[in-house]
Amino acid sequence: RALQLVLLTQKGQIGYPSVLTAPTWGFYDVQFKGNSFSLPREFDSYVMENVLFKISFPAEFHAQTAVEAAVTLHGDIKDRLNDIDKILISTHESAIRIISKEGTLNNPADRDHCLQYMTAIGLLKGDLVAEDYEDDVASDPRVDELREKMVIEEDERYSKEYLESDKRSISNAIQIFFNDGSSTEKIEVEYPIGHRRRREQGIPLLVEKFERNLRTQFSDSRVESIMSLCTNQETLEKTPVTDFMNLMVAE
């Protein structure tokens, strides 16, 4: 519907000036009991500027930074798994409410929405890919052993900044404690690679991911045509939608 309205506007359709304000049957009277909209910000480009791209890992967004922290720690702990006493994960309220899960995970859908599972895979493998949610990976007893050692705590600053419109952080931090009393460094990641605040890092990786996925479907020549068009904004904006969509039709 939003795209349809944009196209109508570009063609000069002015719409109905009184659709909101008409007495009795206008939107304000029918739905808002006579009150008008009260918006936290002016209509602008905030939503598009703050799009989150899922780049690094196929993980639910509240866990992206936890997996990144886990991958960072992988090299330090991969040979000390049996020595781990506790894995402390500091996170935000939304992550605790939505993806913190204990107990049996029955299928990939359970696993890819479990903070502890995704973190465990990152610690064990130094990566997280889609296949890691399947039964053969989940059946590795080390996964649940690590999950059982995890302690989840809320960091109030993380919860606060998750909701702040100028930040919208998705923070997680991990620190691992060993039986001998030693510990790793606390690894904190506040913004995932796909966040607005990490565009400089994220965009090149996003372009690589786009090209990599194109190559699973199209010939080299078609991929080159699509990439050439999509990396030239001026040309792309002038390209009819039908021509663009034709490039995406299977060969």
Predicted feature locations:
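Terminal-appendage/accessory-domain detector
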Residues: L7-E251
